């Protein structure tokens, strides 16, 4: 073996070692790709399972429609319109979907009702993404205390949603503190404490006789700053009976946050129960008037057969769903993915 061969072996290893290293790199890359594909598959399976009721209802109604009609005509579109409204899609959106379907049917000269399935799925997708970029990420940055304000009525799944988001952030290596700002319900504070302990988050609760949510938030900010937390998640009261009180409470919390942390809150998320349908849209309007909102957490999607509420919220409230509840387990609160949602909702209609 010559000098240069020896020198190369010293610097870069023997030929066999170089081949082994190269093979190891290839295997590591393949492993990473496999892990990515597995995560994607698991996410899709979560959507399919969580949307099974909506999917079953959607498929059933589409097939009923196709069995009833031999051709695509005005009567067919009237029945399709009724079906989409029954799926909790707003009347305004349904009219847009119907008009778009009519255009495509006319342009492609389609007469068989069985050929319209893919068109419907495509229109659901394009309407959701029209005039805006779908953004489901949380506004979280390094080297600052990130504040997430969470609002919603009692019983919407607010407590569990806060805990599940905390768990996701903790799993990402973030240090998370929860402020129990629903001071009007002792049971809500106790439940949040139990969940915080379960997911490994710290929590600030009201002191004895402390009924002002803003005071709890004030203390929580000081603790979060002094102990270098990455995330502060603020729970709030969910009383809609008195809109003026609700607006005043949220306004005061927002003032406290802004005075202590520039640009806070960085996220203001509204928790809505998907099973409430159009009532959820009414709730969203009230909360939007009470505090600036950045996104929606849509819970209990696994419990409804009307999956169209996602589209209605975006159209009528102008907010994207950032998280969607697809089951009771901690990992069943998923970051909203439009592709997986449309697939989970319409899976099987072309089979």
UniProtKB/Swiss-Prot annotation:
EC class name: hydrolase
Enzyme Commission (EC) number: 3.6.5.4
Protein encoded by which gene: ftsY
GO BP: SRP-dependent cotranslational protein targeting to membrane
Its job: Involved in targeting and insertion of nascent membrane proteins into the cytoplasmic membrane. Acts as a receptor for the complex formed by the signal recognition particle (SRP) and the ribosome-nascent chain (RNC).
Gene Ontology CC: one annotated term: plasma membrane
Residues where GTP binds: 152-159, 235-239, 299-302
Entry membrane topology: Peripheral membrane protein
One Pfam family here: SRP54_N
Keywords: Cell membrane, Cytoplasm, GTP-binding, Hydrolase, Membrane, Nucleotide-binding, Receptor
SMART domains in the cross-refs: AAA (SM00382), SRP54 (SM00962), SRP54_N (SM00963)
Family label: Belongs to the GTP-binding SRP family. FtsY subfamily.
Main localization (coarse): membrane
Reactions mediated catalytically: GTP + H2O = GDP + phosphate + H(+)
Protein name listed in UniProt: Signal recognition particle receptor FtsY
GO molecular function: ATP hydrolysis activity; GTP binding; GTPase activity; signal recognition particle binding
Cellular compartments annotated: Cell membrane; Cytoplasm
Subunit structure: Part of the signal recognition particle protein translocation system, which is composed of SRP and FtsY.
